[in-house]
Structures are given as structure tokens and as C-alpha cells.
């Protein structure tokens, strides 16, 4: 079977018309192996020129559909909605509107789909160049925070996976919910030898509240950031050792040196944009993660969680609630 027989693509977009158009140009370039795949453009109610560009491509290519949300549901909810569009092809790829593609490694992706690999990682900027660590699930999870890194295969997106994905929209990474469930059931991740997609940083607004009245977005969603969201998702791994290793990989960047995820991102953005503000952001986030969040994560996993879920604590809490309820009933009767 060919790529277009195996793969459906959903492109999520919101108010990035110039980058969106560049993305479409790459997808429909003469050397693009996915130019004949079914492509759904999932527009999160854009107010710029995005709808006009999408309609133009839909009129030029019969394999392109343009869907516009009735409301701006938020970027993460739009990701979950894109996951829900899985089918009828066995493989599903959700991509963004501002990234860069190199198609040289695509033959390996097609071979992996033909073999029936369940989960394929096509991004590798945060992975070791070679060796067994390249396909280590702990390392892959932090790479897969970058949405287009993931191609979902048969049986990965299920009813429960979709429920969990929607439940995790506030935690930034709803697309990791099916991955975590796959790993919980003993699944593996196939990592291709040469990455296909890299993040394209254009210096535009990448906040999770774009298009919303930011002061009215509920606190849980407004204040969640990368490390917290990642800790929430990896906290759902049944393998506690893998959970800890995954979080450690994000914080310390074990495969790319102590500089880690934030250091590499800072250098990348610094080189592309030349903004000194990124330095301050990197210093603040690295200090917070290394000195505060990771120790708290360890305390939670090794002490607080076992304590709060113990039978003794549960029974003590139940007795206390029974006593308080009894007092409340007496007051009502008197």
C-alpha cells in the first residue's frame, strides 16, 4: 500500500496565515510524499486570511477539506478534536501550521506503516543521534510533546484515549494521552533514523490563550505550563520508573547534555530570533524546574502519593467525615 492509502493528515491552524501558506506549499511541493494524502484543514475560527488560503487549496486539490470551528475552542482542544478525526485510513498524522519539513527520510516512514508499526516518531531534535537511547520511551515522550512528531497507528486512538485526551486539554499535551496508554499496555515506539519535521519558530504569539480574553480564562488552564503539563501526563504511566525517567529527561535533557530541553530551545530561538528575552525566560524556567518542580515531583511520588492513598489514611478520613456528618445531622434535628 502507498502513503496515500495508509495515511490521513489533519492540519490545525489559527491566525497564522503566512506560516500556514508556507506549510501548505511544503505539503504540496513536487517532492512531497504526502501531496496526495487526504488532508483536513481544521481551522480554529481564524480571523485573518487563513480561511481564504484554505479555500483556495481546497478548490485546487480534491483531497483537501476545510473545516472551520464555530468557536475558537483553544489550541489544545483543537488538537483533541483533530485526534477525533481519526479514520478511515489506518494511520493518522496531526500537524501544525508553522513547522519545517524534510522529506528525505520518508521512505522509512512508509515502510514502518506497511509493517504495521503502532506508533511512529518522525521528529528527533531532542533525541540521541543513534544508539538504543534514541528509541527509549522516556526520551521519546519529551520529543513527542512536539505534536507533529507523532504518527498514530491502528488501535492507538480509542474511545478511552479520546476521553483522556479531552481531559488533558488544560495540561497542554492531549496528544500524549494515546501515547501514554499505548506504553501502559506494553507498546513500543518506532523512531525513524532521520527526522521529518522540525519546529518552525517565527517569533509569533504561541501562547495557549491566543484569541481568548486571557484574564477570563480559568486559572488552571491559564497557569499550566510545559513542565506541569508533562508531569501530569507522565504521572499516568503505570511504570513508575518510566514516569520518573521521562520527567527527568525533560528537566535534565539526558540525551542532549545538562543544558537540556530548555537550553537547546533557547539556543534555537536565540539563533532564529536574536532576542535577549529568551535568555531570561530560559534562566527562570530552568531554575524553577531543576530547583523546585523536580524535587516536588519526587516528594509526591515517593512520599505524598503513597501516604494519601494508604488504607489507614482513607479509614481515618472516613471516620472524620462520618463524625462531621453526624454533628451536622444533630444540629439540623435540634
Where do the language-model regions lie?
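Glycine-rich, basic loop-to-helix element that forms the pyrophosphate-binding segment
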Residues: 69-87
Amino acid at each position: 500500500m502507498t502513503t496515500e492509502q495508509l495515511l490521513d493528515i489533519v492540519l490545525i491552524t489559527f491566525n497564522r496565515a503566512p506560516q500556514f501558506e508556507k506549510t501548505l506549499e511544503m505539503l504540496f511541493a513536487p517532492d512531497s510524499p504526502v501531496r496526495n494524502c487526504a488532508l483536513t484543514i481544521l481551522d480554529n475560527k481564524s480571523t485573518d486570511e487563513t480561511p481564504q488560503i484554505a479555500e483556495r487549496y481546497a478548490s485546487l486539490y480534491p483531497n483537501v477539506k476545510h473545516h472551520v470551528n464555530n468557536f475558537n475552542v483553544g489550541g489544545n482542544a483543537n488538537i483533541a478534536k483533530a485526534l477525533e478525526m481519526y479514520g478511515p485510513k489506518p494511520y493518522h498524522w496531526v500537524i501544525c501550521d508553522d513547522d519545517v519539513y524534510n522529506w528525505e527520510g520518508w521512505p522509512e516512514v512508509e515502510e514502518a506503516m506497511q509493517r504495521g508499526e503502532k506508533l511512529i516518531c518522525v521528529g528527533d531534535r531532542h533525541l540521541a543521534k543513534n544508539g538504543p537511547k534514541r528509541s527509549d520511551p522516556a526520551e521519546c515522550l519529551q520529543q513527542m510533546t512536539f505534536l507533529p512528531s507523532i504518527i498514530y497507528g491502528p488501535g492507538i486512538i480509542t474511545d478511552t484515549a479520546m476521553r483522556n485526551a479531552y481531559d488533558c486539554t488544560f495540561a497542554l499535551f492531549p496528544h500524549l494521552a494515546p501515547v501514554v496508554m499505548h506504553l501502559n499496555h506494553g507498546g513500543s515506539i518506532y523512531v525513524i533514523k532521520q527526522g521529518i519535521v522540525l519546529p518552525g519558530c517565527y517569533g509569533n504569539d504561541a501562547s495557549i490563550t491566543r484569541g481568548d480574553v486571557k484574564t477570563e480564562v480559568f486559572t488552571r488552564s491559564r497557569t499550566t505550563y510545559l513542565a506541569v503539563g508533562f508531569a501530569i501526563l507522565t504521572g499516568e504511566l503505570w511504570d513508575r520508573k518510566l514516569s520518573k525517567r521521562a520527567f527527568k529527561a525533560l528537566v535534565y535533557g539526558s540525551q542532549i547534555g545538562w543544558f537540556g530541553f530548555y537550553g537547546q530551545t533557547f539556543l534555537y530561538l536565540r539563533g532564529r530570533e536574536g532576542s535577549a528575552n529568551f535568555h531570561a525566560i530560559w534562566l527562570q524556567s530552568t531554575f524553577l524546574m531543576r530547583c523546585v518542580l523536580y524535587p516536588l515531583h519526587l516528594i509526591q511520588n515517593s512520599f505524598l502519593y503513597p501516604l494519601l492513598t494508604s488504607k489507614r489514611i482513607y479509614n481515618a478520613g472516613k471516620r472524620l467525615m462520618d463524625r462531621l456528618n453526624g454533628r451536622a445531622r444533630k444540629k439540623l434535628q435540634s
